Swiss-Prot record:
This is Con-Ins G2b. Belongs to the insulin family. Keywords: Carbohydrate metabolism, Cleavage on pair of basic residues, Disulfide bond, Gamma-carboxyglutamic acid, Glucose metabolism, Hormone, Hydroxylation, Secreted, Signal, Toxin. Residues 59-92 form a propeptide. The keyword Thylakoid does not apply.
């Protein structure tokens, strides 16, 4: 085996390893896949995801500050954005994401929290400065 083909083989193996290491989705779904009996779909998925994200945000820094709540996006706007994201993903042939992970399959609460936007330090520090 020549040095260049050996190098190519090692590079491809490393690339495959990195791809699998950074993949956060466990499943790939098709549009005709049935929903899991315990999966959350549609508005149930949106409501449960929003609830878990708010609980996680409160656990990490609290959301009792009225000023902070006013600066957050309205729940209706967040819901519309989330639903449009789900529709865009559903148009693909094979898709991954929260709809695949938590509707066609079952998600734990921790898996739902993994789909929440990160709590930024600026929002935590601004609430302490008010």
């Amino acid at each position: 085996m020549t040095t260049s083909s050996y190098f190519l083989l090692v590079a491809l193996g490393l690339l495959l390893y990195v791809r699998q290491s950074f993949s956060t989705h466990e499943h790939t779904c098709q549009l005709d896949d049935p929903a899991h009996p315990q999966g959350k779909c549609g508005s149930d998925l949106v409501n449960y995801h929003e609830e878990k994200c708010e609980e996680e945000e409160a656990r990490r820094g609290g959301t009792n500050d009225g000023g902070k709540k006013r600066r957050r996006a309205s729940p209706l706007r967040k819901r519309r954005r989330f639903i449009s994201m789900l529709k865009a993903r559903a148009k693909r042939r094979g898709y991954q994401g929260i709809a695949c992970e938590c509707c066609q399959h079952y998600c734990t609460d921790q898996e739902f929290i993994n789909y929440c936007p990160p709590v930024t330090e600026s929002s935590s520090s601004s609430s302490s400065a008010v």
